[in-house]
């Protein structure tokens, strides 16, 4: 018995020694990791590095970021300030928020910083995208794509978008059970992007399959840049290659068309631009120029820009309107004042039947421009729940920001969400839902930094080209919802919001929809 006790004590002592040594080694490794980045500061500058933590060797604070979501950034902002350092996705990062600092970053494109996204995102989206282009190639690509979002193009899109949104709202009202709004919004925005923006002719089954593959790609965009079995990057690469296979046939058909089925769509403009530069080259010559690969990557980039972000904002719009019935009443008043308060005359469809409606669209860009309160609601949704949390840049040279040095070569991430949350230029607290805050402009909002308090679409040379189209989609959705439907929670409480990779409700937002004027079947909050 005595020898057994000594044996146990010996084993416990050995285990304790092992744990102590492991702890000391981990602590030493962390200190050496921190020292490695401290020594990487630009010694030509007397300014210190921003405060912050570089986390654990190689992993940095990536795991904390993935687990904590938006709380990761807010907790460090409270501890270190609006400019702090961290280490995410394999790179040292300076996190920036606040209008003045964000203005420096966004207006410093090509001078202080250049666009940079996580390596995994660059690998998955490709090298021919607007997102990854720098300098003159970026300006040329932006010039081509700007034609897609010109006012004549938007005038062409609006009636088709309204028709698609009207049919979707009617289908939600005809559903026999609860609708998972986020999933439905993703399917809807993907169909609109494929058929209206890209002009591709795909049937519903193929479009749904394409959407599922694309979603898997986007879910792995922000992953560690390690191409090993079962890694997020490997899953994303498989999804991307499968997506290219699906797109190849549709793009090949597009290349053989003399004129687009829907003039003005994005792929038609890219093809036309290549032909103009090549003086009407043939399809075979376009293929030699690697145009199919360019079109594949451009199509995926446009889908990424239109798909998840618009679906996220659409879901947030529906959620916030449900939480704030007073906004619904004001939208109804504005629609009535503009003679737009009446929904289509088609009778409500029986549950399970086709949601088709033969009514002509009655909205245009000019009509949307007169709906001032609807515009304020959309802006407030994008301010309170911006779909994308921020943007990435790389420092081209060491420069000063808020009393700190930003070393050359380090990544800079400007925060949209944190900037919105801390802006003090509005007449009401920034954490509340108040569309009318956009009805009155304060003196601070007119300052040089004023427009950088509200940046859901970024700013500067990299501002979102499709922002007017996105806002039009949200305005159309608000109008069609308010005048045609009522909706209520299908769950006991409102869901929490997840912020990575795109803002969305954790349960997809389960709601019951009813045609306006009919009795609801639920007991939860409803409109």
Residue ranges of predicted features:
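Cytochrome P450 fold signature focused on the C-terminal beta-domain
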Residues: 40-43, 257-269, 332-371, 384-404, ...
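Conserved cytochrome P450 catalytic core segment spanning the I/J/K helices
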Residues: 57, 150-152, 239-313, 344-349, ...
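Cytochrome P450 proximal C-terminal region
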Residues: 1-23, 165, 213, 336-337, ...
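Cytochrome P450 catalytic-core helices
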Residues: 309-334, 468-483
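Conserved cytochrome P450 K-helix E-x-x-R motif and the immediately C-terminal K′/meander segment
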Residues: 60-81, 238, 242-245, 249, ...
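Conserved cytochrome P450 K-helix/beta-meander segment immediately N-terminal to the heme-binding cysteine loop
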Residues: 414-444
């Amino acid at each position: 018995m005595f020898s057994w006790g000594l044996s146990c004590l010996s084993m416990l002592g050995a285990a304790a020694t092992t744990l102590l040594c492991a702890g000391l080694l981990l602590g030493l490794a962390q200190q050496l990791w921190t020292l490695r980045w401290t020594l990487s500061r630009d010694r030509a500058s007397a300014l210190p590095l921003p405060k912050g933590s570089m986390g654990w060797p190689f992993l940095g604070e990536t795991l904390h970021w993935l687990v904590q979501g938006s709380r990761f950034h807010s907790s460090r902002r409270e501890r270190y300030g609006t400019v702090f350092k961290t280490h995410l996705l394999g790179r040292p990062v300076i996190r920036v928020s606040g209008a003045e600092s964000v203005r420096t970053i966004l207006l410093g494109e090509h001078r202080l910083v250049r666009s940079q996204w996580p390596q995994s995102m660059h690998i998955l989206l490709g090298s021919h995208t607007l997102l990854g282009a720098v300098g003159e190639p970026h300006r040329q690509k932006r010039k081509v794509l700007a034609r897609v979002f010109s006012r004549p193009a938007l005038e062409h899109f609006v009636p088709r978008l309204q028709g698609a949104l009207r049919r979707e709202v009617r289908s939600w009202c005809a559903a026999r059970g609860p609708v998972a709004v986020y999933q439905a919004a993703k399917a809807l925005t993907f169909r609109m992007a494929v058929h209206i923006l890209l002009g591709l002719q795909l049937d519903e089954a193929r479009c749904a399959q394409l959407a599922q593959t694309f979603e898997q790609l986007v879910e792995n965009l922000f992953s560690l840049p390690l191409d090993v079995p079962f890694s997020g990057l490997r899953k994303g690469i498989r999804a991307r290659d499968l997506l290219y296979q699906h797109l190849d046939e549709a793009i090949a058909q597009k290349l053989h068309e003399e004129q687009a089925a829907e003039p003005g769509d994005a792929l038609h403009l890219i093809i036309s631009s290549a032909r103009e530069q090549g003086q009407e080259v043939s399809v075979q010559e376009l293929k030699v120029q690697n145009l199919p690969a360019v079109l594949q990557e451009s199509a995926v980039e446009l889908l990424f820009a239109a798909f998840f972000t618009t679906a996220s904002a659409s879901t947030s719009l529906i959620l916030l309107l449900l939480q704030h019935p007073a906004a619904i009443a004001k939208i109804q008043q504005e629609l009535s004042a503009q003679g737009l308060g009446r929904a289509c005359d088609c009778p409500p469809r029986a549950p399970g039947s086709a949601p088709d409606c033969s009514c002509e669209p009655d909205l245009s860009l000019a009509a949307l421009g007169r709906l001032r309160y609807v515009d304020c609601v959309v802006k407030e949704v994008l301010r309170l729940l911006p779909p994308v949390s921020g943007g990435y840049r790389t420092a081209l040279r060491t420069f000063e920001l808020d009393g700190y040095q930003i070393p050359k070569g380090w990544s800079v991430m400007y925060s949209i969400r944190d900037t919105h949350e801390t802006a003090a230029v509005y007449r009401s607290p920034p954490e509340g839902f108040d569309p009318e805050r956009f009805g009155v402009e304060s003196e601070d909002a007119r300052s040089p930094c004023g427009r950088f308090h509200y940046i859901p679409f970024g700013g500067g040379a990299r501002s979102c080209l499709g922002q007017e189209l996105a806002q039009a989609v949200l305005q159309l959705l608000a109008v069609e919802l308010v005048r045609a439907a009522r909706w209520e929670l299908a769950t006991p409480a409102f869901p929490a919001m997840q912020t990575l990779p795109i803002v969305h409700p954790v349960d997809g937002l389960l709601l019951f929809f009813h045609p306006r004027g009919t009795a609801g079947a639920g007991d939860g909050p409803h409109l």
